[in-house]
UniProtKB/Swiss-Prot annotation:
CDD domains: YlxS_C. The keyword DNA-binding does not apply. The keyword Cytoplasm applies. The gene is rimP. One of its GO terms (biological process) is ribosomal small subunit assembly. Keywords: Cytoplasm, Ribosome biogenesis. Belongs to the RimP family. It comes from the Bacteria. It comes from Bacillus subtilis (strain 168). GO terms for cellular component: cytosol. This is Ribosome maturation factor RimP. Gene3D superfamilies: Ribosome maturation factor RimP, C-terminal domain, RimP-like superfamily, N-terminal. Its main location: cytoplasm.
Length: 156
């Protein structure tokens, strides 16, 4: 298959999700043990409920059955990304200003590759995270292209 499974599924899922005024957050196609899982994560400003997940699952399952883009057997799961949703797109960072985030970088910045703190600023190129070291607050500027992965962080 020349196209990645996730890209093909995204093309099928996006119109379904858009028609329900939801956001397509992420798609994973992973093997766990002997089974393959196609996971589709959806969200909205108000969160998503089981009915919305079921609507997306039913409509997407129908499209997947018609096109049959995946050769192996798999389980389709449609759900919310949860409290620690991934930040994949620039718009995700813009919507998460003021929230606690966990960011891992491809290479160290000031000798560190993992940052957890408040997302203070985002200008489209640089993410600024305010971290607390003991009792002192410090702002770290992280170039967007150096972010390996990022997600919201739940703190207790």
């Amino acid at each position: 298959m020349s196209k990645k499974v996730t890209d093909t599924v995204q093309e099928m899922a996006q119109p379904i999700v858009d028609s329900l005024q939801l956001e397509l957050v992420d798609i994973e196609f992973v093997k766990e043990g002997q089974s393959w899982f196609l996971r589709v994560f959806i969200d909205s400003d108000d969160g998503v409920d089981i009915e919305e997940c079921a609507k997306v699952s039913e409509a997407l399952s129908e499209k997947l059955d018609e096109a049959d883009p995946i050769s192996q057997n798999y389980f389709l799961e449609v759900s919310s990304p949860g409290a620690e949703r991934p930040l994949k797109k620039k718009a995700d960072f813009e919507k998460s200003l003021g929230k606690n985030v966990y960011i891992k970088t491809y290479e160290p910045i000031d000798g560190v590759k993992v940052f957890e703190g408040e997302l203070a600023e985002f200008d489209g190129q640089t993410v600024t995270v305010e971290i607390t070291i003991k009792t002192r607050k410090k702002r770290i500027n992280i170039p967007y292209e150096k972010i390996a992965n990022a997600r919201l962080a739940v703190t207790f």
